[in-house]
């Protein structure tokens, strides 16, 4: 499934996603090593957010080859086995991410009001 709710539901329960960066998965999973800036923009919605890496939420890879998948899995497993404290904090952080419709709904309401006033 290129997107859907699976990854967002699983994160809520502590699963750390390892995904191929395609479709909606690319829109919702931000690689812990390479996508801090994009995660800060997409999750927090603001470029003035202090980029600390707190918005990253998984491990991703490009392409469809076995090497890409292996690389992403190796990074995930390495962090689990070699830095368990970091991994647990990472799980807690992604469990707190809000993927509800609250923020998008408010964004749309603000857009509609600005169009009416404009």
Where are the model-predicted features located?
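C-terminal alpha-helical cap of glycosyltransferases
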Residues: 102-118
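Catalytic binding pocket for nucleotide-activated donors in carbohydrate/polymer assembly enzymes
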Residues: 1-89, 95-96
